[in-house]
Each structure stands twice: as structure tokens, then as C-alpha cells.
Amino acid sequence: MPQRNNLRWPQACMAGAILLSGIAWAEAQAANSPQTSILELGKELQVGDVVFIRIPKPPFTKVADTTSSWTNHVGIVSDISGKEPVIAESRVPVSGETSWSKFVQRSDNGRVAVTRLPVPLDKQQQSKLRAAVAARRGIIYDTGFDLHSKWQFCSRYVREVLDEAAGVKLGEVENFSTLLKHNPQADQTFWKVWYFGNIPWQRETVTPASLLQDGRMRVVFDGQAD
């Protein structure tokens, strides 16, 4: 099974078809979501908070559609000691850390959600989290979304970092067969193109949606920040 490791022309050819639905989605969200400023929301963040956004381009929009969720990207707060919080994430092309404002500004129409463990991370757990982040810095983004590959993708990254810091494995591990069975509306044509005509049905993965839906976390904010 070939691994996807770069965004190539088949994905780009589908961008136009996805754009219109993305615009409609953004307009609907603007009318229905709580609003705050990026600055004010940033003041509330704690190390270990999990932050969800929506990147408005494929394949990420298709990830959201396939999981029946608005979110398609996730990061974790790794530092709050500077001028603004820092978000650790697995991103294209390699994993790293991003300022809070830049992270949220990448989201479609400023859509963002923040979830938190019931008990804040203690100093030892925060130190473990930063060590887990450092160990994953510079790892290539896995566009094959394989939970067991040598690379990383966003939800796997956050799941592993929080597990190493606090012993909490967020989200539900699913194979592609189960995931698409639970979401029959998913565009299988897109995924067949994405995987060169052969969807890896038994491949295990974990999605941003399953991390957001994890009942062990409490929602700190779910709306728009600008």
C-alpha cells in the first residue's frame, strides 16, 4: 500500500468543487456560534488544553465531511509563559509549534473549540508534555492517516502527547471500514483518488472529531474567535 506523503494534483483538482460548500458552511457558522477575540480566549488557555480548528481546503474539509464534524485539525497547548500561548501540532509539512494567534487565524471563519481535562496538568505532567512535543518536532506529516506509521498526523499527535503527559488516550481508534460505515455520506470517490484507487479499509486511524467528542474532556469554548 503506497503511503501519501505529499499533496499532489488529484487533490488540487477537487478543490474547486469543495470551495462552494465551504463558503456555505462558513456563513452558517457565523450566524450561530458564540464569539470572542483571539486575545481574550488566549488568556484562558492552560497547558494541555486541546484546540480544534477547521482548515478550509482539501483533504482536511473531506476529513470533516467523512466524520460528520465541523473540525478537521487539532493541536495542544504546550506553553503559556510568553506573550501568547503556543500550540504544538502535526502539520504540513512537519510537526512543530505555532503561536496561538496564527493557529486560530488558519481556521475557517475563526471557528475554534477548546477542551480541557477535569484536573489541570501538574508541573511534572507539563514537563512530560513538553518532552513529548520536543520528541516529535520535525516529523513528516502523514497524509495516509495511519496510526502506526513512522510519521504523524494531527489527531494522532495530540493523542500521543497527552497520553505521555497524563496517561489519557483521547478519541476512538477506528479502521477506515468502520469509519466510512458509520458515515455513509462520505465521498468515497475522493478517498479512492486520495489512495490511488485503493482505500486501505483495515488501516487504523483516529480523527479530530473523536477527540472533540471524548466525554472525559470539558468544553472551555466552542465558537468563533477573531
What name fits each language-model region?
Residues 2-14:
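Bacterial N-terminal signal peptides that target proteins for export
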